[in-house]
Amino acid sequence: MELAVIGKSEFVTGFRLAGVRKVYETADIAATESVVKSVLEDKSVGILVMHNDDIGNLPEMLRKNLNESVQPTVVALGGSGSGSNLRDKIKQAVGVDLWK
C-alpha cells in the first residue's frame, strides 16, 4: 500500500521532499476532482492525504465518497475545519460523540 498526496504546490512539496512517490499537484478544483477520482480507483493507494480546504471545495457526492472510503483511508490536514472533521471521524468510528 502506498501513500498518495493531492493538493496545491505549497501543500504537496513537503511530502515530495520526504520521498512520497504518488504526489499530485493540482492548480484548480477541476484538476483536483479528476485526480481524486483516479486515486480512488487506484488499488495500490492505502492512504490519501489532502488539505481540508481542498476536500471542502469538492462536489458533495465526491466528498461523501471520500468520507466513507475505507481504502484508501482519507486523511485531511490543515484548514479551519480540522477540529470538527476529526470529531466527526471519531464519532463515525466509535458510534458515540466523545466530546460531549
UniProtKB/Swiss-Prot annotation:
Membrane disposition: Peripheral membrane protein
Record-level Gene Ontology MF annotations: ATP binding; proton-transporting ATP synthase activity, rotational mechanism; proton-transporting ATPase activity, rotational mechanism
Known partners and oligomeric status: Has multiple subunits with at least A(3), B(3), C, D, E, F, H, I and proteolipid K(x).
SUPFAM superfamilies given in the database record: AtpF-like
Gene: atpF
Subcellular location(s) of the protein: Cell membrane
Keyword Chaperone: no
Gene Ontology biological-process annotations: proton motive force-driven plasma membrane ATP synthesis
InterPro entries per UniProt: ATPase_V1-cplx_f_g_su (IPR008218), ATPase_V1-cplx_fsu_bac/arc (IPR022944), ATPase_V1_fsu_sf (IPR036906)
Function: Component of the A-type ATP synthase that produces ATP from ADP in the presence of a proton gradient across the membrane.
Keyword tags: ATP synthesis, Cell membrane, Hydrogen ion transport, Ion transport, Membrane, Transport
Main location as per UniProt: membrane
Protein name: A-type ATP synthase subunit F
Lineage top rank: taxon: Archaea
GO cellular component, one term: plasma membrane
Family: Belongs to the V-ATPase F subunit family.
Hydrolase recorded as keyword: no
